[in-house]
Amino acid sequence: MGFEDLLDKVGGFGPFQLRNLVLMALPRMLLPMHFLLPVFMAAVPAHHCALPGAPANLSHQDLWLEAHLPRETDGSFSSCLRFAYPQTVPNVTLGTEVSNSGEPEGEPLTVPCSQGWEYDRSEFSSTIATEWDLVCQQRGLNKITSTCFFIGVLVGAVVYGYLSDRFGRRRLLLVAYVSSLVLGLMSAASINYIMFVVTRTLTGSALAGFTIIVLPLELEWLDVEHRTVAGVISTVFWSGGVLLLALVGYLIRSWRWLLLAATLPCVPGIISIWWVPESARWLLTQGRVEEAKKYLLSCAKLNGRPVGEGSLSQEALNNVVTMERALQRPSYLDLFRTSQLRHISLCCMMVWFGVNFSYYGLTLDVSGLGLNVYQTQLLFGAVELPSKIMVYFLVRRLGRRLTEAGMLLGAALTFGTSLLVSLETKSWITALVVVGKAFSEAAFTTAYLFTSELYPTVLRQTGLGLTALMGRLGASLAPLAALLDGVWLLLPKVAYGGIALVAACTALLLPETKKAQLPETIQDVERKSTQEEDV
């Protein structure tokens, strides 16, 4: 008797599993609230050099700015430069300082802002950019905060993956909640930029526990038949978190209070641990038979299955322990031991890198649109659910490979088309970004389904772990790619679209899994590859 047989006895899908899905909804909603938090927390409002002695009379302020600030090519005042010598404004006297005496002949001399900046506070009362002046020459420091956060997620995923196998999913979920709460509070209370970057990076490592632990806690209590459906349902909670972030961001305009609001839900999460079941499969692999039996009986009772303690005899449970321990624990090296597994792994790594790079590149940069940041975030969240529904129908009709390649190609084309559209046509830019968001979200959803079906059962979790690591690498580099606009304004879009195009072509190299029986062993993968070559 294997564990699947035990699960069949106590119920592989019922009220017990549904309660578990609801309990796991909180960490799934917390993730996008933190992952996408820089959209609000690190936003850069309109700004210009601080000009001491500005007139109190509002009617004179534009003239004062005209005298002190150069204009950009689009007619707006410069955000990063000021005149070395104030320029004389015809027919207006703004004070004794407004004079060009001492300035050399020729073009007016400009210098960087030396006394700080003044910010437009109409949309945000404070962000990390306004608090620590992360603008102009320091704008790279603003982007680095997101990169460090995702590097923390990457490192944390490796650590939590090891620790959860050693100490259990439930215990490490509690650690993730507590550490995310403590580090989130410390981030909100940061007294300087360095403290913020360090605590934010550690927060990313703590939150990585949710990405690693939640899925096994769900899947290891579900029968095979309902795992895909439950997986799709659980992704809806991510979209819910995106929408919730838009609402919370609109209501809270200070980055410290916003970060606090995104962190405090960890408190009910800590309380919910009381009802979260440990993975009975993991308990059996550790030889903790009595604890596993307690959870299995609880599952049977809640699911209405007439299973007594005699049905889960000590002998039957010990047999499962023997079988589970006999299974060889896979490593990342196993993903490259055969030619077909190497092919699948390398292609999936590129696809996941491209999916994450384009998704976060698009999601974290909402500038230049015809909507404010709150409307944009709300629209981004609203478009995710239709994207998931679209994927459901496309993978059934076109298959996984063509759907994945098509969605990535669609994202690449929207980036490419935006290069041809004038930046002044805000409505067209907004429409293209929303369409690109839909394609990138659909590519994300398809990637989870496609990858899980490509790997054999014995390597499925390991394969997903490797590809997810590459995805997080793409997510960490996406904010830095936005800095390429210093070389050429449109270069970030070229980078995002180019990587998406390469990932789309790579997806076409993967085998189709539509209506195919899921491989159980490495031999199944190699056998299927041989059969396809013969055909």
UniProtKB/Swiss-Prot annotation:
<dbReference type="GO" id="GO:0015139">
    <property type="term" value="F:alpha-ketoglutarate transmembrane transporter activity"/>
</dbReference>
<dbReference type="GO" id="GO:0015742">
    <property type="term" value="P:alpha-ketoglutarate transport"/>
</dbReference>
<feature type="transmembrane region" description="Helical">
    <location>
        <begin position="232"/>
        <end position="252"/>
    </location>
</feature>
<keyword id="KW-0406">Ion transport</keyword>
<comment type="function">
    <text>Functions as a Na(+)-independent bidirectional multispecific transporter. Contributes to the renal and hepatic elimination of endogenous organic compounds from the systemic circulation into the urine and bile, respectively. Capable of transporting a wide range of purine and pyrimidine nucleobases, nucleosides, and nucleotides with cGMP, 2'deoxyguanosine and GMP being the preferred substrates.</text>
</comment>
<feature type="transmembrane region" description="Helical">
    <location>
        <begin position="375"/>
        <end position="395"/>
    </location>
</feature>
<dbReference type="InterPro" id="IPR036259">
    <property type="entry name" value="MFS_trans_sf"/>
</dbReference>
<dbReference type="GO" id="GO:0015711">
    <property type="term" value="P:organic anion transport"/>
</dbReference>
<keyword id="KW-0472">Membrane</keyword>
<feature type="transmembrane region" description="Helical">
    <location>
        <begin position="344"/>
        <end position="364"/>
    </location>
</feature>
<feature type="transmembrane region" description="Helical">
    <location>
        <begin position="464"/>
        <end position="484"/>
    </location>
</feature>
<dbReference type="GO" id="GO:0009925">
    <property type="term" value="C:basal plasma membrane"/>
</dbReference>
<dbReference type="GO" id="GO:0015347">
    <property type="term" value="F:sodium-independent organic anion transmembrane transporter activity"/>
</dbReference>
<dbReference type="InterPro" id="IPR004749">
    <property type="entry name" value="Orgcat_transp/SVOP"/>
</dbReference>
<keyword id="KW-0812">Transmembrane</keyword>
<feature type="transmembrane region" description="Helical">
    <location>
        <begin position="21"/>
        <end position="41"/>
    </location>
</feature>
<dbReference type="GO" id="GO:0035634">
    <property type="term" value="P:response to stilbenoid"/>
</dbReference>
<feature type="transmembrane region" description="Helical">
    <location>
        <begin position="202"/>
        <end position="222"/>
    </location>
</feature>
<keyword id="KW-1003">Cell membrane</keyword>
<feature type="transmembrane region" description="Helical">
    <location>
        <begin position="144"/>
        <end position="164"/>
    </location>
</feature>
<dbReference type="InterPro" id="IPR005828">
    <property type="entry name" value="MFS_sugar_transport-like"/>
</dbReference>
<dbReference type="Pfam" id="PF00083">
    <property type="entry name" value="Sugar_tr"/>
</dbReference>
<feature type="transmembrane region" description="Helical">
    <location>
        <begin position="489"/>
        <end position="509"/>
    </location>
</feature>
<dbReference type="GO" id="GO:0006811">
    <property type="term" value="P:monoatomic ion transport"/>
</dbReference>
<dbReference type="GO" id="GO:0008514">
    <property type="term" value="F:organic anion transmembrane transporter activity"/>
</dbReference>
<feature type="transmembrane region" description="Helical">
    <location>
        <begin position="257"/>
        <end position="277"/>
    </location>
</feature>
<dbReference type="GO" id="GO:0022857">
    <property type="term" value="F:transmembrane transporter activity"/>
</dbReference>
<feature type="transmembrane region" description="Helical">
    <location>
        <begin position="402"/>
        <end position="422"/>
    </location>
</feature>
<feature type="transmembrane region" description="Helical">
    <location>
        <begin position="178"/>
        <end position="198"/>
    </location>
</feature>
<comment type="similarity">
    <text>Belongs to the major facilitator (TC 2.A.1) superfamily. Organic cation transporter (TC 2.A.1.19) family.</text>
</comment>
<dbReference type="InterPro" id="IPR020846">
    <property type="entry name" value="MFS_dom"/>
</dbReference>
<dbReference type="GO" id="GO:0015132">
    <property type="term" value="F:prostaglandin transmembrane transporter activity"/>
</dbReference>
<protein>
    <recommendedName>
        <fullName>Solute carrier family 22 member 7</fullName>
    </recommendedName>
</protein>
<keyword id="KW-0813">Transport</keyword>
<feature type="transmembrane region" description="Helical">
    <location>
        <begin position="429"/>
        <end position="449"/>
    </location>
</feature>
<dbReference type="GO" id="GO:0015732">
    <property type="term" value="P:prostaglandin transport"/>
</dbReference>
<dbReference type="GO" id="GO:0005886">
    <property type="term" value="C:plasma membrane"/>
</dbReference>
<keyword id="KW-1133">Transmembrane helix</keyword>
<dbReference type="GO" id="GO:0016324">
    <property type="term" value="C:apical plasma membrane"/>
</dbReference>
<dbReference type="GO" id="GO:0016323">
    <property type="term" value="C:basolateral plasma membrane"/>
</dbReference>
